[in-house]
Swiss-Prot record:
Annotated SMART domains: Inhibitor_I29
Name of protein: Uncharacterized protein DDB_G0286021
Pfam families registered for this protein in UniProt: Inhibitor_I29
Segments on the Cytoplasmic face: 168-218
Extracellular topological intervals: 20-146
C-alpha cells in the first residue's frame, strides 16, 4: 500500500518564489533528510553538502515550474518501507500527478533522481562524456541543469532529454552483444567394408541344432 504525502515545502516554495523569498537552509535541509529516508538514499559525510546543494536547486526549480500552473499543492507517492538504494532508469518513467481529480493538471515532482545534475545523470546512466557540455535544450529547461522529478506532461524539452537518455543506453547495450562465429561445415570420407550380403535365414556354418527343439509333422 502506498502513502500519499503532501509536500507543504514545495507549496511554500511556490508561493515564496513569487514574492522573491526562499525558505531557510535549515528548513530545506530537514526536508532533504526526509526525502533521503523516503527513498532509502545514503551519503558519506563528504558528499552530504554537495548533494544537498543539488537537491535544493532542483526543489526550487520544481517550485518555480509549478508556480506557473497556479495550483496550491503538490503530491508525491512513497512506499511504506524504504526502497532499494539501487536506482534504475525505470524509475525515470513519467508519472502524472493530479492535485484535484476534477482538474486535468499535471505537475512536476521530486523523485529519487532529484539529487543529481543533468551531467551526473548522463554520466551515470547514459555513459556520456563528462567533458561535453550539457545540451542547450536541457539547460534551457532547467536553469540549474538538474534532473527534477520526471512527473511531467507539460515540458516537451525535458521529456525529449529523458527520451534521448534512454536511446543512448539502448544503443550502447546493443553494441555490447557478443559476436557468435558461424559454424564451419566439414566433410569426412567414410570407408565401406566389403560384405557378402545379409543372411536372412541366419544359416551360419556352425549353427547349433538342438534335438529336443525339433518337431515332426506328418
Amino acid at each position: 500500500m502506498k502513502i500519499i504525502v503532501l509536500v507543504l515545502l514545495i507549496l511554500g516554495c511556490s508561493q515564496l518564489i513569487n514574492s522573491q523569498e526562499v525558505p531557510s537552509d535549515s528548513i530545506l535541509f530537514q526536508q532533504f533528510i526526509n526525502w533521503m529516508d523516503n527513498y532509502g538514499i545514503f551519503y558519506t559525510s563528504g558528499d552530504m553538502q554537495s548533494k544537498f546543494k543539488s537537491w535544493k536547486s532542483n526543489v526550487l526549480e520544481i517550485a518555480s515550474l509549478n508556480s506557473n500552473l497556479n495550483v496550491p499543492d503538490v503530491l508525491y507517492t512513497v512506499t511504506e518501507t524504504p526502497v532499494s538504494n539501487l536506482r534504475t532508469l525505470l524509475d525515470a518513467e513519467p508519472t502524472i500527478v493530479e492535485s484535484y481529480p476534477g482538474q486535468d493538471i499535471q505537475q512536476f515532482e521530486v523523485n529519487q533522481f532529484s539529487d543529481l545534475t543533468a551531467s551526473e545523470f548522463s554520466n551515470i546512466y547514459a555513459g556520456a562524456d563528462a567533458s561535453l557540455a550539457i545540451s542547450e535544450v536541457a539547460a534551457s529547461t532547467l536553469s540549474t541543469g538538474a534532473i527534477v522529478g520526471i512527473a511531467v506532461g507539460g515540458s516537451v524539452a525535458l521529456i525529449g532529454a529523458t527520451a534521448a537518455t534512454v536511446l543512448i543506453v539502448k544503443k550502447k547495450r546493443q553494441n555490447k552483444k557478443p559476436q557468435v562465429s558461424e559454424p564451419i561445415a566439414t566433410t569426412q570420407d567414410v570407408k565401406m567394408k566389403p560384405t557378402n550380403g545379409i543372411d536372412l535365414l541366419n544359416r551360419t556354418e556352425n549353427q547349433h541344432r538342438s534335438i529336443t527343439a525339433r518337431a515332426f509333422y506328418s
